[in-house]
């Protein structure tokens, strides 16, 4: 039987799996949608957020962030930017995952000793760094850099490497 990964058929499915793994993180969801200074405060935000309701809204796999999106809640965009056949096993594919974090400047400051974009990046790493998701090998964190700065928002790009299994 031919490998589905070898022909890219499972790549989109795996991207959705990663997005859903991020949606399981309540602190990440709260950082994305609670736009006040204390987004994790259980007294002001006592309820859990239905993570799946944020798919394609705050956590996206379609790399589109409009001008309107730049002034509202923070967004995460997942993008596989590169893939290649694993040299030691041609049924596996080495993937490069980019996660872009878009945060309006008016939401950067939060209570505590950090800024919202870095709190979001920390929760992303807690969710997927060195983890395995069904059909994927270990997700390895490679680093981050500033991606975009506009008058309304700033964006950071995180890089991960993944070995996708057949």
Task: Briefly describe each language-model feature range.
Residues 1-87:
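Small/polar-rich, solvent-exposed N-terminal microdomains that initiate assembly or binding
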Residues 42, 49, 65-77, 105-125, ...:
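Acidic, Ser/Thr- and Gly-enriched intrinsically disordered low-complexity segments
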Residues 115-166:
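Acidic-leaning, charged glycine-interspersed low-complexity segments
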């Amino acid at each position: 039987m031919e490998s589905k990964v070898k022909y890219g058929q499972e790549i989109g499915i795996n991207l959705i799996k990663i997005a859903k793994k991020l949606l399981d993180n309540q602190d990440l969801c709260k950082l994305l949608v609670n736009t006040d200074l204390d987004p994790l405060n259980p007294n002001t935000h006592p309820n859990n957020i239905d993570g799946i309701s944020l798919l394609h809204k705050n956590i996206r796999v379609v790399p589109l962030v409009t001008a309107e999106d730049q002034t509202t809640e923070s967004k995460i965009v997942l993008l596989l930017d590169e893939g290649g056949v694993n040299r030691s096993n041609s049924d596996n594919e080495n993937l490069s995952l980019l996660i872009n974090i878009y945060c309006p400047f008016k939401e950067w400051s939060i209570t505590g000793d950090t800024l919202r974009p870095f709190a979001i990046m920390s929760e992303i790493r807690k969710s997927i760094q060195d983890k395995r998701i069904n059909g994927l090998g270990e997700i390895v964190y490679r680093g981050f850099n500033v991606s975009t700065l506009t008058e309304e928002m700033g964006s950071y790009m995180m890089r991960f490497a993944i070995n996708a299994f057949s």
